[in-house]
């Protein structure tokens, strides 16, 4: 048990570093607070966590040392986060340090009718409602952005929009049909989310403007993100994949469609706790339709996988490796063509209640019927 009295210096250090905006946090802090000159003593103070020496690092890998000022020992927040086993983050907009889960903050509602308004509204704690229409991100001015969390990355034939460390953002299309968000560069993803949390897309259609078969970018790309909710939406090709995910957790995909993508429906690596429910993955021309690598607890329930076609010999409709907890329950595989489907190389997948009809699979297909 941690002695609360011993934590007083920790918490004092937390508040101290927040006010002064110094790098003892072990995270990047961008702030313009008031300045106070103080005397500090560095005395090679060591931090042990559960008997193990801990050396908190800064954003550039440098060691962050505790120090003493006026008899109080100030300790990096990174050390506190390690003690409690919680992530630590800094929000420059609210000038807040978060250890573990961030508090729920009511999102600001904004209604937009064109792509300029959409771009201006993007950010944390926003619920953006899109009026019916097409929002072409490539129509935006794409120069230098002073917003460090929203910026453009140059690709081979244009720019790609990056949302970095965005929290609690909802994009919701208004009307009976989804609001459509598109990009023109074939090497750009429509949206790339990096280190984002609590992202929601509702009634959104997203894809590329150019002809099918010409893309090298995907639709939605999630990197080191969590708590993603996609519902009543359509992700379409020519994008390479509808969903690209790496080191991402807790993604929910409900009542939605991925269609006509050129490399497959989705690819994921080092991910966990994904749930696809009441959704359709169809008409993709694929190398491997669904790629799952080094991931766990990926569940498809009441989904339809239909009319997909392999364009390379020895292509697998499911490419699963170094993964566990993969389930296709109550799903339908139908009218898929020329894929390999050998249950012997994917023996740990649960196909309870799943049916197969009208497929032309190569390889062994024996589900104990």
Language-model regions, residue ranges each:
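Short glycine/acidic-rich loop motifs that flank beta-strands on beta-rich extracellular proteins
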Residues: 139-140, 182-190, 209-218, 239-246, ...
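Surface-exposed or flexible loop/turn and strand-edge residues in extracellular/cell-surface modules
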Residues: 35, 42-44, 94, 107, ...
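Right-handed parallel beta-helix
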Residues: 168, 172-177, 197-208, 226-237, ...
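Primary recognition of N-terminal secretory signal peptides and signal-anchoring hydrophobic helices
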Residues: 2-106
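Short aromatic/basic micro-patch
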Residues: 74, 111, 200
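Extracellular beta-strand-rich solenoid/capping regions of secreted or surface-exposed proteins
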Residues: 120-124, 136-172, 181-203, 207-226, ...
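Extracellular beta-strand solenoid repeats
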Residues: 129, 136, 162, 170-172, ...
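Right-handed parallel beta-helix/beta-solenoid
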Residues: 102-120, 134-135
């Amino acid at each position: 048990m941690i002695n609360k009295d011993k934590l007083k210096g920790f918490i004092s250090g937390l508040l101290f570093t927040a006010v002064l905006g110094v790098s003892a946090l072990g995270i990047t802090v961008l702030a313009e607070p008031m300045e106070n000159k103080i005397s500090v003593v560095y005395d090679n103070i060591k931090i042990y966590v559960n008997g193990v020496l801990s050396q908190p690092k800064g954003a550039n890998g440098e060691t962050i040392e505790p120090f003493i000022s006026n008899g109080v020992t100030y300790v990096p927040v990174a050390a506190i986060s390690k003690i409690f086993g919680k992530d630590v983050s800094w929000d420059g907009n609210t000038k807040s340090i978060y250890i573990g889960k961030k508090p729920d903050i009511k999102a600001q509602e904004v209604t937009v009718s064109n792509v300029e308004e959409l771009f201006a509204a993007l950010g944390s704690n926003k619920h953006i409602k899109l009026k019916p229409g097409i929002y072409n991100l490539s129509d935006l001015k794409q120069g230098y952005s002073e917003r460090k969390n929203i910026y453009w990355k140059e690709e081979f034939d244009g720019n790609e929009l990056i949302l970095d460390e965005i929290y609690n953002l909802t994009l919701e299309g208004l009307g009976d049909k989804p609001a459509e968000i598109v990009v023109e560069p074939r090497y750009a993803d429509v949206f790339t989310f990096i280190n984002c949390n609590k992202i929601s897309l509702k009634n959104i259609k997203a894809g590329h403007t150019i002809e099918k078969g010409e893309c090298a970018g995907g639709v939605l790309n999630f990197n080191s993100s969590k708590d993603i909710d996609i519902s009543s939406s359509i992700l379409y090709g020519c994008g390479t994949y509808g969903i690209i995910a790496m080191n991402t957790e807790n993604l929910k995909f409900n009542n939605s469609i991925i269609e006509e993508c050129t490399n497959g429906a989705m690819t994921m690596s080092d991910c966990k706790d994904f749930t696809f429910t009441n959704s359709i993955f169809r008409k993709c021309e694929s190398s491997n339709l669904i790629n799952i690598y080094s991931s766990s607890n990926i569940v498809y329930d009441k989904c339809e996988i239909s009319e997909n076609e392999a364009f390379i010999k020895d292509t697998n409709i499911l490419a699963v490796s170094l993964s566990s907890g993969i389930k296709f329950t109550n799903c339908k595989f139908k009218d898929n063509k020329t894929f390999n489907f050998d249950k012997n190389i994917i023996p740990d997948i649960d196909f309870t209640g799943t049916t197969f009809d009208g497929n032309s699979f190569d390889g062994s297909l024996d589900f104990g019927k």
